[in-house]
Amino acid sequence: MYEQTLYKILPNHIKSSIIKQQNRYNKWKYGYNKDHDVIIISKTGKIGEIYEIQNLRIALPLMDNSFKRDSKKEEQYWEQLKIPKELEKIKSVFDWNKYPDSFKEKWYDYIDNEFKHREEGFSFYNNGVPTYVTGTHYMYLQWSKIDVGAPDFRESNRLFFIFWEACKADPRCYGMCYLKNRRSGFSFMSSAELVNQATISSDSRFGILSKAGADAKTMFTDKVVPISLNYPFFFKPIQDGMDRPKTELAYRVPASKFTRRKLDSQENPEEMEGLDTTIDWKNTGDNSYDGEKLKLLVHDESGKWLRPDNILNNWRVTKTCLRLGSRIIGKCMMGSTSNALDKGGDNFKKLYYASDVTKRNRNGQTNSGLYSLFIPMEWSYEGFIDTYGIPVFDTPKTPVKGIDGNEIDYGVIEHWQNEVDGLKSDSDGLNEYYRQFPRTEQHAFRDETKQSLFNLTKIYEQIDYNNDLRNSNILTRGNFQWEGGVQDTKVIFYPNKSGRFLISWIPPYHLQNIVISKNNMKWPGNEHIGAFGCDPYDISGTTDGKGSKGALHGRTKFSMEDAPSNTFFLEYISRPQTAEIFFEDVLMACIFYGMPILAENNKPRLLYHFKRRGYRGYSMNRPDRPFSKLSATEREIGGIPNSSQDIIQAHAAAIETEIEDYVGLTETGYGTMYFQDTLEDWARFDITRRTNHDASISSGLAIMACNKNKYMPTEKREIVSVPLGFRKYNNEGTTSKIIK
């Protein structure tokens, strides 16, 4: 049974008594409400349900007098209402002005209601459920012409437009970064919003960018212009130029021509007011729209910018087009599927994750200024939407009538899985399908297998398995602390949602904090169970505020103890405020589990920290050399260098073997590697740029530490014949002869 996680309703986010009191006096203001940490998209002063979409809390308007298409529940669904025939033939405000006042009075209420729906939104009964759509969504459904005629109502689009309205309402937000699947309708929806906003804005500019200038032009000529052309006369402002322009759609008064006759008769040209607003498109480039002020920028196909164009560089430029000082005056509607990572997908991925609403700076903004939204493919896949716009997730007991009139006899999840199973033997084809029709964010950013050093098929099998809800509770986040805050006593693990450690297993109590003392040195008591690998750092701060993170991984090996065999059980990828905090974190983990650590010694402060505290016995020596051949520093603090080509190759081979044997689908089931960040780092590992892969370095060292015997050098045994001084005789015949 499919359980959706795209959104949830929060019935208790604000006390009902507070909502009723504020509703009574229409006191809820459109925008961000800091007191209740919610974005209010109601323009009536009243709020109803509160949605949470991708961690963004949004208060919807209170729905009164919802429209009913029919009194029967099963006949209640969205249906575009045709414009009255008397108004259908009126093409412009000039035609309207020619009609008598009696005719106009008849239609003023109808026109006023349409403007009200455009401003405040619209609610209707959908299969017996009152359903709210924003004003922008209403304009898309009711008055926008797309390639198939009238758009269908889809629940996924409703949630999209609610999220978009929240982006517009929030003064901290520059817009949205929408990670989509193919044929989701984003190009038409964003085109409809361009026309909707441009036709009610004065002295404004609206822009379009895409993966190439030709694509931006096509979007303008084939989507934006037809939508504008088919608007009813009461929404259509005065337009300058051609009816179907190629480069710019201008809502302004055309220049009046003064003829000799008009001048001689002193006839004044008719005074008209225009919006002085334009919609245009630009060629793709890092500096497109540089220095211009925009009210809305539509960024289509932003995950497909090929070199030398860079979406990150362009966003840094166009972001300034949407603000005056600290005040945000425009918004960006960005959306795309993702190309392979080296074909523009990597930059879009960085931009998407920089738009996480849970990670804000002190100004309350995300790193990019945008808000990220991902709608899984099952919400908008063609052929699996019922009459009410709701996806058919699971296979129904009886066929369901689709929005296109065809019957749906099995669910979209089953269909998607069948497609995936059919592509199992074609890794690149499978990953392309994942990128086009993703069910998770990880699917959307799948890379091409030919670019990876390791077996991407098995890595992604494990990632998909981990994403299953059944495996979501295996990992626990938390921190290690000394008992009572006293160093060198017992270490205790405390769960903490903001902790730096992720663990999947802790040893039984009798195996915790096992420390052996010998020769005035402390040694780990559980070396036979497993070991740690670590990629440390030495400097607390960096000039750019970035720097690589410290990484630590714990892995078990085969043992007779009560512990899982050959399993990663700990992941630490973090950069605390000071290096000393990191050193102590690593030390406490080693002591709690009672296991040694194999760390890179090129940055030796961590290992000196171990030695200074009396834990030199926990630091493993490099396994590829006997003790007699170690350098003086290696004898003092242990560790392994990362500069040797032999070590680099052995390290990569260790990860490769681990993936083949213990990751993804194996003979006994799926692997037990539950750490997604490490799996994703393995997937994009580049052996020529190892410094960018902290998780891969430390996890590989953990594997080597658990299999140290494989790397022990073996001396060649040479058998040499040594003469002992005895003569040898040939006794054939009657006389013995000396053998020379």
Which residues make up each language-model segment?
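Pre-P-loop entry segment of helicase/translocase ATPase cores
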Residues: 2-175, 685
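RNase H-like, metal-dependent nuclease domains and their acidic two-metal-ion catalytic environment used
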Residues: 2-27, 38, 44, 191, ...
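Walker A/P-loop
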Residues: 172-194
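Residue-level preference for the first positions of well-ordered beta-strands
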Residues: 175-177, 205-207, 296, 596
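Post-Walker A helix-loop "phosphate-sensing" segment adjacent to the P-loop in P-loop NTPases
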Residues: 197-204
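Conserved nucleotide-state-sensing and coupling region of NTP-binding domains
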Residues: 205-285, 463-464, 470-474
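Substrate-engagement module of ASCE P-loop NTPases
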Residues: 316-329, 335
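Short alpha-helix plus adjacent loop in nuclease-associated cores
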Residues: 619-665
